[in-house]
């Protein structure tokens, strides 16, 4: 992550708060900037088997026709509420563990970096999962929901605390390997890319935007492709409901059709084959490539200006 400006972890307390602030800023910028693509991806993955197949463009047109341009941003409040704290936790713990495992930014151990990212994920997802569930319910234009507060209240009343953690196990199963690939790829790509775009001595360099854009984008794309099947399962689990109907394309009365992660994986394979696991893969790769470029650029920038 931040080896570009020769920072030291001598003041671990100060560094920890820098990472909290930088992580929060990066998470907010990433999710707000990429939200429309995430909405489209969620619609694609939530389409029921046997329903008419639709493209990203068709879904985009349908959402705008039915709900206006704001339909692409429905649920954004939930993301804004959850992204900043979850990313703050994620990056601060990641940096702390990376330092404990490796010690110096000059050393490079992809496996240790990946493990640090995976452990950080387990903590941050506990913060992010409830808002992720609310976000996806709102993204699918569930007409019974009047907004963030109403959606949150009704999930609590109808489904209890378990409703906010629907797909949580799948999220962890997906995000642990995702973040192993993601963080290891980012750090590795950054080491490779730095000599290409910079002629200065690495010890004298400050913030270099191109490093983080390219390394972040590449890492996000690789990790997204690797874990797409788990993301499909997670989306199906989080968006199923036994008490409301959806107004999306191919709308149909929703029922709880998946008993859990393993049942969802089995059912998708039987009913849809490999194509089911690959739903939304292209927009997801685009989304994670662009969002990762944003998050790393903003994160490293805030670390730099905060003196890290």
UniProtKB/Swiss-Prot annotation:
Protein name, entry field: Mitoferrin
- One GO term describing the cellular component: mitochondrial inner membrane
Q: Which GO terms describe its molecular function?
A: ferrous iron transmembrane transporter activity; iron ion transmembrane transporter activity
Q: Where are the Solcar repeats?
A: 14-100, 108-192, 207-305
Q: Which SUPFAM superfamilies match?
A: Mitochondrial carrier (SSF103506)
Q: Where are the transmembrane segments?
A: 13-29, 69-89, 111-131, 168-184, 213-233, 285-302
* Recorded family membership: Belongs to the mitochondrial carrier (TC 2.A.29) family.
Record PROSITE patterns: SOLCAR
Point out the signal peptide segment. Answer: none
